[in-house]
Amino acid sequence: MIHDVSERAYQLERSGQWVKGKSCDTFGPIGPWLVTTDEISDPQDLGLWLEVDGHRYQDGTTKTMVYGVAYLVAYLSQFFTLQPGDVISTGTPPGVGMGVKPDPVYLRPGQEVRLGVDGLGEQLQITVSDE
């Protein structure tokens, strides 16, 4: 699993591609381990969740992904050769803080972020300021 972290100020206030807001140092932690295809019976049937300070913001499954795993592998294979050990990030379930209405929620220093994928484990990060 990958924590799909976004620096929204980079994405919203600095125009251009959104990828720059996902490419900061320490963003995109992977783990607690990687699994191979023989270790997951159905990659389109995994629960996904994320909590901030104990409040669950995201709770979904891989069934609701815009693009399935097989499609993503086939599509990306058209542009470059995938090798054993390559990692493809598939995105995030519904419920991102920026989409909270009427007032978006953004991470602040010191907050505890926990996320997990059923059967694959959990991650825990404490947010810090870059200043």
Please report, for each region that a protein language model flagged, where it lies by residue:
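Extended Lys/Arg-rich, glycine-bearing segments that form polyanion-binding/interaction patches
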Residues: 1
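Active-site glycine-centered loops adjacent to acidic/histidine catalytic or metal-binding residues
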Residues: 4
